[in-house]
């Protein structure tokens, strides 16, 4: 009879992946990224261990929002004071901070716990095609 294997944090081998977001739908990009960050693509997935890989996303400013989401999708933040609700749509957020749309989509798909925050730190998003992780030699992944 086989025993259940439990992976320890020290036993995890993290790889580096590169995803080009040029012309890719935001939802497909975010689901693939969140799955890899959690490590769900590995056969020995353990939900309580950070066993996900590192991901570099380039050309985040060229990600595609379907339908009329560019104007209709709203991002909310609150200052904590009465009347402190701030609302910005996707078009203005893209003009102000292009990487924020991708980061918010991926962060919303990760667990809202300490482990989820730790896994989110393995994501590197760049607006253009130049990135600082050349030395890690990331493997390119195509989003379908």
Swiss-Prot record:
Q: Which GO terms describe its biological process?
A: negative regulation of translation; translation
Instruction: Cite the SUPFAM superfamilies for this sequence.
Output: Ribosomal protein L13
Q: Where are its TM segments located?
A: none
One example of the protein's molecular function in GO is: mRNA binding
- A GO CC term? cytosolic large ribosomal subunit
| Alphabetically ordered keywords of this record | Ribonucleoprotein, Ribosomal protein
Query: Record's InterPro entries?
Result: Ribosomal_uL13 (IPR005822), Ribosomal_uL13_bac-type (IPR005823), Ribosomal_uL13_CS (IPR023563), Ribosomal_uL13_sf (IPR036899)
**Matches recorded under Gene3D superfamilies:** Ribosomal protein L13
Specify the domain of life of the species encoding this protein. Answer: Bacteria
Question: What's this protein's function?
Answer: This protein is one of the early assembly proteins of the 50S ribosomal subunit, although it is not seen to bind rRNA by itself. It is important during the early stages of 50S assembly.
Q: Oligomeric state and partners?
A: Part of the 50S ribosomal subunit.
Tell me the protein family, please: Belongs to the universal ribosomal protein uL13 family.
Under which name does UniProt file this protein?
Large ribosomal subunit protein uL13
Q: Which organism is it from?
A: Mycoplasmopsis pulmonis (strain UAB CTIP) (Mycoplasma pulmonis)
